[in-house]
């Protein structure tokens, strides 16, 4: 079919992920998230990439249940709120948020007490994007040295804003935060860890911009 897919409630589950993604993406068909949940089946070592356009309808809250080790390359637009539910171990986001004015919530759902990585394949450049970290989510960049720009960052206790690099000691990672001019509170911890964890450390730097208030309540160690 040639029109958009509008999801207003319930869950739309794709078991044949490859064909479903092609149906949305190959012809530029758009998925309009307007209150429902989009879910993708996952098999071990199944590295999925989703690139179909996504519009998040104004005044709605919608959810995407992401597959582990997947990559989101969609153009995201709209004014609603979108939640990404990420299972152990990680999920990559390499999307354009230039036309998105809502809030992106990232909910890490760990297994056996572990944390979940939410990261860009290279570095973040989303000066309007407001990100809220929930669950046990780490936010970082996969490339070794990264200059990240994010509109705003909030988060629960137990979340982390880390540095960059998968497994390189001595990385340099900067976070420029505040371009959305919104008031945000981050209860998590900002540290010098690489995305692999405390076994590899580098230098994480913070630059606050914009007119909003950014409250940091955690025991930050960067």
What are these regions (language model features)?
Residues 51, 72-73, 150:
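Hydrophobic residues on conserved beta-strands that form the core of alpha/beta folds
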Residues 18-21, 44-45, 91-93, 144-146, ...:
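Acidic Ser/Thr/Pro-rich low-complexity disordered segments
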Residues 1, 17, 26-38, 42-54, ...:
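N-terminal extracellular ligand-recognition/capping segment immediately after the signal peptide
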Residues 35, 42, 68, 86, ...:
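Trimeric beta-solenoid/beta-helix "fiber body" segments of extracellular/virion adhesins
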Residues 38-48, 54-58, 142, 146, ...:
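Self-maturation zones of extracellular/virion spikes and adhesins
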Residues 38, 61-62, 137:
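Hydrophobic residues embedded in beta-strands of well-ordered beta-sheets
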Residues 1-27, 58-130, 157-222:
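Extracellular repeat-rich scaffold modules on cell surfaces
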């Amino acid at each position: 079919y040639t029109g958009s897919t509008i999801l207003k409630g319930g869950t739309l589950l794709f078991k044949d992920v490859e064909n479903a993604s092609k149906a949305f993406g190959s012809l530029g068909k758009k998925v309009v998230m307007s209150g429902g949940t989009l879910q993708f089946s996952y098999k071990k070592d199944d590295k999925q990439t989703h690139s179909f356009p996504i519009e998040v309808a104004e005044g709605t809250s919608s959810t995407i249940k992401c597959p582990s080790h997947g990559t989101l390359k969609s153009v995201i637009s709209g004014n609603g709120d979108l939640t990404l539910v990420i299972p152990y171990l990680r999920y990559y986001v390499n999307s354009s948020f230039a036309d998105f004015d809502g809030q992106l919530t990232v909910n890490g759902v760990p297994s056996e007490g572990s944390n979940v990585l939410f990261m860009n394949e290279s570095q973040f450049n989303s000066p309007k994007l407001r990100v809220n970290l929930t669950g046990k989510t780490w936010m970082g960049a996969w490339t070794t040295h990264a200059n990240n720009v994010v509109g705003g960052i909030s988060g629960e206790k137990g979340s982390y804003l880390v540095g960059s690099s998968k497994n390189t000691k001595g990385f340099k990672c900067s976070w420029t935060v505040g371009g959305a001019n919104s008031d945000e509170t981050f209860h998590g911890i900002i540290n010098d860890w690489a995305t692999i964890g405390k076994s590899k450390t580098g230098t994480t730097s913070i630059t606050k911009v914009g007119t909003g208030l950014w409250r940091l309540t955690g025991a930050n160690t960067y």
